[in-house]
Amino acid sequence: MLLPLSAAAQYDEPCDSITSIVERVMDKKIKATFNVDFCTSLNGYFTEGDFDGASLKLNRLRLDLKGGISEQFSFRVRQSFNKAYDKNSTENVPNSLEYANIQWHPNPGFKLTVGKQFLTIAGYEALANSMYVREFADFNDNLNFYRLGITGAIKLDQERNHELQLQIANNRGGTDADIYSYGLPAGIEPTKLPFIASVCWSGYFDDKAWNLIYAASVAPVAKGKNLYYLSCGNIYEKGPIFAYLDVMYSREEIDTQQRITSLQSGGLVPVTVQNAEYLSFIAKFEYKFNSKWSAYVKGAYETSGIYKENGIFGAGRYMTNWNAQASVEWVPFEKDKGFKLFAHYLYKGYSLEGPAAFLNAYVPDIQRVSLGAIYAIPVL
C-alpha cells in the first residue's frame, strides 16, 4: 500500500513549479499582464543619397510578462527575439533576456528590485519603450542597458513626486574580449570588480507636467581605469504636447563604447583607445492632433573625442555626428490603441575632425525611409 502512495507523492506538482505558477496566473491568483510586442516595417536604404535597396524588417518581437504575486511582491520577465541568444559568461543568461526580476515594496515609499533590470542611467530616450523608438542616438545604441543588479528606490516626499535610486549592477555580461575588439591596451590588467554604481534622482513639477531625471555612475573597467557617466532627462508632457531634452556624457579611461577605436583602418596596427569621451544632446517634440493622429520631429547631436593623449592618439575631437528624424503615426482603431501605423524618415550624418585624419577612416551619411506597424498584443 505504501508504494502507490509514495509514487503518487513523488509526482505531485510543487507549488513553485512553472506549471503551478502558470495555473495561478490563468486562475487570476496572480495579477499579471502578458503582452506580445511586435514592430515591423518596410525600409528603403540610402547611402550618400544613392538608393541601396529595400527590405522588410522585423524590428522588435518580444514577450513581456509582469504582475503582482502579493501586495508586497511583484515581478517582470521580458524576452526579446531580436538579440543574441548566446549565454554570456558573467550573468549566465543571454542578452535577449532583458528583464528577469523580483520587486519588493513593503510600503509606498520604498521599493527594492533584484535581478536583471534596467541600468540606472537618466535620459528619456534610453528609458523609453524601445518599441516606440525608431532610431536611437549612437550613445544609447552602443550601450547594453539591461544588467543583473540590485536597486533601492526611496520616495523623498509624502506626495511621492521625488525619488532617489541607488543601484549596484554588473557593468558587463561577458569578458573583456567580448567588449574590446582589440583587447585591453598593453600593460593594463583586467578589473576584478566589474560593477557599476549609480545614483539617480527623479522629480515631478508643475502638476507633473515636468519630469526631471538626473543620474551619475562610476565603474572600474580595468585595474586603475574607470568609466564615468553623467546623464539627465528633461521631459515635458501636457495636453497634446510631449517633448524632451536629454544630455548624456561619458568619460572612459578605456574606450568602452568603441566608437573611436572602430575608426582605425588599413595601414595601422589597431589597439583599444584610452581616455575617450562622448557627449550627446537628444531632443524630441511630439504633437497629438487628436486621438488617432500624431507627429514628431527628433534630432541628436553627438561628439566623440580624446581628452588626454595616449600612444598615437592625440587629444581633441575626432568625430561629430547627428541625426534628424520625422514621423507621422496613426492609430486606426479607437478600441485598440496598441495597434499603430507609422511613416518615418531618418538622416544620419558623420564628420571626421582633424585629429582623426591619420586613421584613414570613412563614415558615410545614411538615410532611411520606413512604413511600418506596431502592435502591443494583450494576451493576458
Regions found by a protein language model. Give the residues of each.
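Short aromatic-enriched loop/helix-cap "lid" or pocket-rim segments at secondary-structure transitions
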Residues: 125-128, 178-179, 257
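Glycine-rich loops and low-complexity Gly/Arg-rich segments
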Residues: 61-62, 136-141, 177-178, 190-194, ...
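Outer-membrane beta-barrel architecture
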Residues: 20-22, 62-64, 100-103, 151-153, ...
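Outer-membrane beta-barrel pore domains
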Residues: 12, 47-51, 89-90, 209-380
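Exposed loop/turn and edge beta-strand positions of beta-sandwich/beta-sheet ligand-binding modules
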Residues: 59, 96, 108, 146, ...
